[in-house]
Amino acid sequence: MEVGCVYIITTQLYEPLDIYKIGCTKDINRRLKTMNASRISFDKFFIVNQIQTFHYFKLEQGLHKLLKKYRLNNEFFQCNVNIIEKAISDYANNNVFMLHDDKIAHVAIEKKLKWFQKNNLFSITDTNLEIFLNESSLINEIKQWLSVFDKHNLYKFLHPSHFYNIVSYLKTVCIQNDDEEEFLINEMNMLSINTKDDNSKDDNNDSEDLSKQIDNLKLD
């Protein structure tokens, strides 16, 4: 899963003029390298601020609308950087649930969330243990992630469809290939067989113990 970022960049020549470029990308370092490849050393772009987000394209478009009166052309704006940062704050305050999605995205990455399409199963890794979840279980897990940082429990007021939309998105970015899913199925089947064998052995042992007890009773 990839989280993108909205960046605010400028150059030594642009900064005194309050000129900034506001854009979005999945890889800011690669973007800077490309943009600076043909620029002279004292006029290379550098990062003023960057915001990692699940909704980097929406945030970029939202900022462009809020700052449209300062637009020079395309992604270039002429205004004090404090005005840009206030626009970021205003956008976030009016789209508070975007922060929820960002938190979910970061935790999903940390827990190595995967989706196995054929079986409609998810997996997360917790303390080196792979745990499998269906959709309902994943939604409960997501609510638990949100409860850690959502002090006002705003997530409880979200419509259920919001969580199903999140799950649908997670499916698109966490889908695993058929080979890995086939491996998973085989592993689960082997685990099931081994569990049955162990239970069968336990039953046989219990039966042997019972037979011995009966024999002892006969001898007595």
Swiss-Prot record:
Taxonomy, superkingdom: Viruses
Pfam name, any one: T5orf172
SMART domains for the chain: T5orf172 (SM00974)
UniProt-recorded name of the protein: Uncharacterized protein 460R
Chain positions covered by the region annotation Disordered: 196-220
Organism of this sequence: Invertebrate iridescent virus 6 (IIV-6)
